[in-house]
A protein has these predicted regions:
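M16 family metallopeptidases and their MPP-like homologs
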Residues: 1-16, 24, 37-145, 163-171
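Short Ser/Thr-interspersed hydrophobic loop/turn segments at strand-loop and sheet-helix junctions
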Residues: 28-32
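Short, exposed beta-strand-loop hairpins at the edges of beta-sheets
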Residues: 155-157
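Extracellular/periplasmic ectodomains of large secreted or surface enzymes and adhesion receptors
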Residues: 175-176
Length: 176
C-alpha cells in the first residue's frame, strides 16, 4: 500500500474550507486514477480523500492511496507526490472542477431525501452546535459558489512537497 498525506485543518468552524478540500481531493483522485491506473497500469483503484476532525480544530488531512505490488510502491509514491506538486504549481482546470462538482451536487440532492442525513448529520448534533442547521441549509449554494481560484489556492497551500508524508506498507520478506 502506498499512502500520501498532507495536513489540513479540522472541520469544526471550518466547513466551507472542508467543502473546497473535498473538491480538491476529488480532482487529485481523478489525476491519480488517470496516471496510476490508466497510464501506468500499476494499480486498479487509487483514490484520494479528505478528513477533518470535529473535535480538534487543527487536525485534518488530504490523502492519496493505492494498493500495488511491493516493487511498485516507490513509483506509486513518487507519482502521488508529483501529481500533488503539479496541482500546487500549475493548478486544476475548469473542466476538472466541473467533473468534481457535478457528482457532489448530485449526492447532496440525494441526501436531502434521506432520514439518515437529517437525523444523523444535522439534527443529532444541532442542539450542541446550532450552526449545523445553517450549514445544511446553505451547503448547495456554497458548493455552487466554489471557484477554480479557491481550489488552486488550497492546492498551493496544502500540497507542498516538504510537508508530504509518504508511507509504504509492504509484506515482510520471507527471511523475516
Amino acid at each position: 500500500v502506498a499512502i500520501s498525506l498532507w495536513q489540513t485543518g479540522g472541520v469544526r468552524g471550518n466547513q466551507k474550507e472542508m467543502r473546497r478540500l473535498n473538491l480538491l481531493s476529488s480532482i487529485y483522485g481523478d489525476r491519480l486514477r488517470e496516471e496510476i491506473r490508466e497510464k501506468l497500469g500499476a494499480s486498479y483503484s487509487p483514490n484520494a480523500g479528505v478528513s477533518g476532525s470535529e473535535a480538534l480544530e487543527d487536525f485534518g488531512y488530504l490523502v492519496g492511496q493505492s494498493v500495488g505490488k511491493p516493487e511498485d510502491l516507490d513509483l506509486l509514491l513518487k507519482t502521488m507526490r508529483d501529481l500533488a506538486d503539479t496541482l500546487a504549481t500549475e493548478g486544476a482546470t475548469a473542466d476538472e472542477l466541473d467533473r468534481a462538482i457535478k457528482p457532489t451536487l448530485g449526492e447532496l440532492e440525494q441526501t436531502l431525501r434521506q432520514n439518515s442525513y437529517w437525523l444523523g448529520t444535522v439534527l443529532s448534533k444541532s442542539q450542541q452546535d446550532p450552526a449545523r442547521l445553517e450549514l445544511a441549509r446553505n451547503r448547495e449554494a456554497d458548493y455552487k459558489s466554489i471557484t477554480l481560484e479557491e481550489i488552486n489556492e488550497l492546492a498551493k497551500r496544502y500540497f507542498k512537497a516538504e510537508s508530504a508524508l509518504l508511507v509504504s506498507i509492504k509484506p515482510a520478506s520471507p527471511s523475516e
